[in-house]
């Protein structure tokens, strides 16, 4: 696998593949990779002739009191895992490469509406940071296909909306959430959990599953939401949000809606965990 922190190197290699009529898939990450990321890379390899990955801990998407400095950097292990999964080109830029004028003087990409609810309400500016860095990476790599995990459901919809609104010729593919045996969604932030917290953490998925089951049986949104929140609190979580939304727009779900998604974020110990369930009724 070729690794470079320089934009020109990435563009040169991709152009060489393009000159031979070959296709390119892209998997952007922040590193500290787990099996969910590896699944994205393997899926990417099945879609295109070549796979490009990136590792960049993006300061623009972290808030003032968030874990930017504490976010684990594990480049050597990540590189080995990416190579084994089928990535051929790895882009590892520094903040100076991506934001040479600094964050305050950087042009931003902002997706209105969908960026301002749920995680966007809890983390103001987060999705502006996500949309900006992903747009920049798309312009550098210019892939045919880009893959993202369904665990970050709101992020996936933000990126799909950005690609559609800006007429970017890229297919965005969401890949099913990879879970531990307990049902806990794999996340780089699971490393913050103590043994006791990790044992309690599967309650997040269990609460979401119970909500969906009740809604399918005709129970009210409000009743199932309150029951699920109570279960989370009993398990040691502090809920940030737990909501039922329209699956395509993330607008508040209405009783007549069929395409639904339950989205949750909750704190346990030092970790803020997110999960979701997309379903029809």
Swiss-Prot record:
GO molecular function annotations of the record: ATP binding; pantoate-beta-alanine ligase activity
CDD domains: PanC
Biological processes, Gene Ontology terms: pantothenate biosynthetic process
Binding-site residues for beta-alanine, renumbered to this chain: 61
Catalysis: reaction(s): (R)-pantoate + beta-alanine + ATP = (R)-pantothenate + AMP + diphosphate + H(+)
This protein's pathway: Cofactor biosynthesis; (R)-pantothenate biosynthesis; (R)-pantothenate from (R)-pantoate and beta-alanine: step 1/1
Active site residues according to the UniProt entry: 37 (proton donor)
HAMAP family: PanC (MF_00158)
Name recorded for this polypeptide: Pantothenate synthetase
């Amino acid at each position: 696998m070729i690794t470079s922190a320089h934009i020109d190197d990435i563009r040169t290699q991709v152009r060489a593949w393009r000159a031979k009529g070959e296709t390119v898939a892209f998997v952007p990450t922040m590193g500290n990779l787990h099996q969910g990321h590896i699944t994205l890379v393997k899926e990417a390899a099945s879609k295109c002739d070549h796979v490009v990955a990136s590792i960049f801990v993006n300061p623009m998407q972290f808030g003032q009191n968030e874990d930017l400095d504490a976010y684990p950097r594990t480049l050597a292990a990540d590189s080995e895992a990416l190579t084994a999964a089928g990535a051929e080109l790895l882009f590892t830029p520094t903040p100076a490469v991506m934001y040479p004028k600094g964050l305050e003087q950087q042009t931003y990409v902002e997706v209105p509406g969908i960026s301002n609810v749920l995680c966007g309400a809890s983390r103001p500016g987060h999705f502006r940071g996500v949309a900006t860095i992903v747009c920049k990476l798309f312009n550098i790599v210019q892939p045919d296909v880009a893959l993202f995990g369904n665990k970050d459901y709101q992020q996936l919809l933000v990126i799909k909306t950005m690609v559609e609104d800006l007429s970017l010729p890229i297919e965005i593919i969401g890949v099913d959430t990879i879970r531990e045996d307990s049902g806990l969604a794999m996340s780089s932030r699971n490393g913050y959990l103590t043994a006791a917290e990790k044992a309690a953490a599967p309650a997040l998925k269990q609460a979401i599953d119970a909500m969906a089951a009740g809604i399918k049986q005709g129970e009210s949104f409000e009743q199932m939401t309150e029951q699920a929140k109570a279960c989370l609190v009993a398990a040691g979580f502090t809920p940030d949000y737990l909501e039922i939304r329209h699956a395509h727009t993330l607008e508040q779900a209405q009783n007549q809606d069929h395409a639904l998604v339950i989205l949750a974020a909750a704190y346990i110990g030092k970790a803020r965990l997110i999960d979701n369930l997309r379903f029809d009724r």
